[in-house]
From Swiss-Prot:
Tissue: Detected in stems (at protein level).
Pfam families: Cyclotide (PF03784)
Covalent S-S links between cysteines: 4-21, 8-23, 13-28
Keywords assigned by UniProt, alphabetized: Disulfide bond, Knottin, Plant defense
Domain notes: The presence of a 'disulfide through disulfide knot' structurally defines this protein as a knottin.
Domain of life: Eukaryota
UniProt similarity note: Belongs to the cyclotide family. Bracelet subfamily.
GO BP: cytolysis in another organism; defense response
UniProt cross-references to InterPro entries, sorted A to Z: Cyclotide, Cyclotide_bracelet_CS, Cyclotide_sf
Function as written in the Swiss-Prot or TrEMBL entry: Probably participates in a plant defense mechanism. Has cytotoxic activity against HUVEC cells (LC(50)= 2.26 uM) and various cancer cells including HeLa (LC(50)= 3.48 uM), MCF-7 and K562. Displays very weak hemolytic activity. Binds to and induces leakage in phospholipd membranes, particularly ones containing 1-palmitoyl-2-oleophosphatidylethanolamine (POPE).
Cross-link type Cyclopeptide (Gly-Asn), residue numbers: 1-30
UniProt protein name: Cyclotide hyen-L
Length: 30
């Protein structure tokens, strides 16, 4: 997928999750 410039190491994807991104290997991907 495409990296969404948000990490999810300590907290889940927040803003980018609204854009359809999900956590994968500590990084939010679309």
């Amino acid at each position: 997928g495409i990296p969404c410039a948000e990490s999810c190491v300590y907290i889940p994807c927040t803003v980018t999750a609204l854009l359809g991104c999900s956590c994968s290997d500590k990084v939010c991907y679309n």
